[in-house]
Amino acid sequence: MHTGTTLTQFIIEEQRRTAGATGDFTSLLNDVVTACKAISNAVNKGALLGVMGALESENVQGETQKKLDVITNDIMIRSNEWAGHLAGMASEEMDDVYAIPGQYPLGKYLLVFDPLDGSSNVDVNISVGTIFSILKAPVAGRAAKAEDFLQAGTKQVCAGYAIYGSSTMLVLTFGHGTNGFTLDRDVGEFVLTHPAMKIPTETKEFAINASNMRFWEKPVQRYVDECLAGKTGPRGKDFNMRWVASMVAEVHRILTRGGIFMYPKDTKDPSKAGKLRLMYEANPMAFIVEQAGGAATTGYQRILDIAPEGLHQRVPVILGSKTEVDTVTGYHHEKAA
């Protein structure tokens, strides 16, 4: 039995500290948390419920959808469409904005989410997660349009992710620190277990898909070569390489023990500036990481400063321990000079 601060208590105390708070945001976040609990249960029981494996359909990204992609997307929608807090939703799994059904009132917030990040790993029992971001609607009470969502990451009211692994955790930021909560399944409540999470500025771990090395830009090749050179190289220390192929798992490791995660720009598909989606993955994770003392860039600019051009825009992502991110970003700027 837990004896610590529950997420419900934490959110209400946050509300009390916010001038003019009406409780709308608190209620919205509670609905998001409820969805994450339901998704955790679905992921945990996947094979028992017969929901593992792929479908014949593709999402807007051209990626083959897993059964759980569709199920978890539906859970997020059904949990959040009805309460009157939202003007609209956008999901990595849907082509366009999800309009709030006419029988429900419209609110003043926008919800953006990736319902099951890392879903390609779900069949092999590797940690996956849900990533979400909450924005203010430009016009409260009006059905949201696609352009309403195209706000820089600095405009996020809240960002978070749930990770479904050996335990289910929820990591949140409201813009003044990053906090982690662990689900106590006995009582069905998230409990504060990782207050004021901080990413070490120095690290000896880097995460990147090295099979794409031949497609990387020179600054990334240089950085990885220097890491691999170890103590006898220019960095003067040995590094370990990690790669889980689940952004939630990578970022969670970095938040708990440091490191740098890179999904850089490459020439594998010149039509794509990067692999990860700005709205659904890069912005919320950049917000979380920065609030934990880390840094997040594309190699050329701060991710949170990007002016979005589309709901499904892709960007390069380099995030984690500030010293390492600054080093890689510096190499990109040297190239551009």
Swiss-Prot record:
Gene3D superfamilies found in the cross-reference section: 3.40.190.80, Fructose-1,6-Bisphosphatase, subunit A, domain 1
GO biological process: fructose 1,6-bisphosphate metabolic process; fructose 6-phosphate metabolic process; fructose metabolic process; gluconeogenesis; sucrose biosynthetic process
Reaction catalyzed: beta-D-fructose 1,6-bisphosphate + H2O = beta-D-fructose 6-phosphate + phosphate
CC annotations in GO: cytosol
EC number: 3.1.3.11
InterPro entries found in the cross-reference section: FBPase_C_dom, FBPase_class-1, FBPase_N, FBPtase
Organism superkingdom: Bacteria
Binding site for substrate: 117-120, 209, 275
Alphabetic keyword roster: Carbohydrate metabolism, Cytoplasm, Hydrolase, Magnesium, Metal-binding
Any Pfam family matching the protein: FBPase
Cofactor note: Binds 2 magnesium ions per subunit.
Residues that, per the record, bind Mg(2+) 2: 114, 117, 281
Molecular function in Gene Ontology: fructose 1,6-bisphosphate 1-phosphatase activity; magnesium ion binding
Positions annotated to bind Mg(2+) 1: 92, 114, 116
Pathway as given in its UniProt record: Carbohydrate biosynthesis; gluconeogenesis
Subcellular location: Cytoplasm
Required co-factors: Mg(2+)
Similarity comment: family membership: Belongs to the FBPase class 1 family.
NCBIfam families: PRK09293.1-1 (NF006778), PRK09293.1-3 (NF006779), PRK09293.1-4 (NF006780)
Subunit composition and interactions: Homotetramer.
Name of the protein described by the UniProt record: Fructose-1,6-bisphosphatase class 1
Gene symbol of the encoding locus: fbp
